[in-house]
Amino acid sequence: MLDPRARTLLKTLIERYIADGQPVGSRTLSRYSGLELSPATIRNVMSDLEELGLVSSPHTSAGRVPTPRGYRLFVDTMLTVEAPIDAEAVARQVQNTLQAGEPQQRVVAAAASVLSNLSQFAGVVLTPRRSHVFKQIEFMRLSDKRILLIIVTPEGDVQNRMLATPRDYSPSQLTEASNYINAHFAGLSFDEVRRRLRDEIDQLRGDMTTLMHAAVTASTEVPDTEDTVLISGERNLLEVADLSSDMARLRKLFDVFDQKTGLLQLLDVSSHAQGVQIFIGGESTLVPIEEMSVVTAPYEVNGQIVGTLGVIGPTRMAYNRVIPIVDITARLLSLTLSQQ
């Protein structure tokens, strides 16, 4: 537990390091902390913070820099997040980019782009998970013994499947079957629909049962595509010296983007939490580069979390600026997708 003096000096050190990118010495801390302390006293406090693992001393400098542990304490207990001065402009840019009525994949890709543009780092979005339940089903007769099955998920995703049936069905029969399924089974998983159809088989005509079983089978055969990670603005990170100053670190950075496995795991973890999450490299095992942080937030469709978005940047990022960008974008993406 830090005393108020140590907390103030640590907060000042991290804020100055984020702003300038240079190790922070006692003279700078004396100037910006607002504390009337001698250089010797400040150096003693810095030594204590270093022993606690909150700051470290680069070999080439008398100043100190925050460690991942120091950043974690800062973002958890010292950071004051306020709406950015241009909050309305940020919201307006997000709204203008995320157009309701556009295909879901295009809206989600636009969210990654707007996160990158606003933060000047990389924007990342985990696309909505494929739903295992349905909101509505329709049958459309194409030709003899060939039917188009149209599945609408609660997220507004539309999936089409071709059915080859052993007999022909009239449009009225197809309407009857879809009305029955929608009235009795909407909102259920296809496995649950299959189970209930077995229980209700005696109450249904044989021709309707055959068609419904064919529809359920086709629905569960729709490939459950892997969660997709969309990234925008990777090149922005090439301008960040903390991430691109040596070849080994640069190689790690692009491994993150190429493989995406680690990002997928991180975004999946953050989708189970409420609100903005901050993952700090060197402190979180989910971030493979010590100099990298990821700020994430889940987004929803009609109150149900379906994915995650965020900003990838240096650990030395202005968290008080990036956090509102991520939060606003997540809220407006949720609103846009819910209006689809």
Curated annotation (Swiss-Prot):
Pfam families: HrcA, HrcA_DNA-bdg. GO terms for molecular function: DNA binding. GO terms for biological process: negative regulation of DNA-templated transcription. It comes from the Bacteria. Gene3D superfamilies: 3.30.450.40, Heat-inducible transcription repressor hrca homolog, domain 3, Winged helix-like DNA-binding domain superfamily/Winged helix DNA-binding domain. Keywords: Repressor, Stress response, Transcription, Transcription regulation. Negative regulator of class I heat shock genes (grpE-dnaK-dnaJ and groELS operons). Prevents heat-shock induction of these operons. Belongs to the HrcA family. NCBIfam families: hrcA (TIGR00331). PANTHER family: HEAT-INDUCIBLE TRANSCRIPTION REPRESSOR HRCA. This is Heat-inducible transcription repressor HrcA. It comes from Burkholderia cenocepacia (strain HI2424).
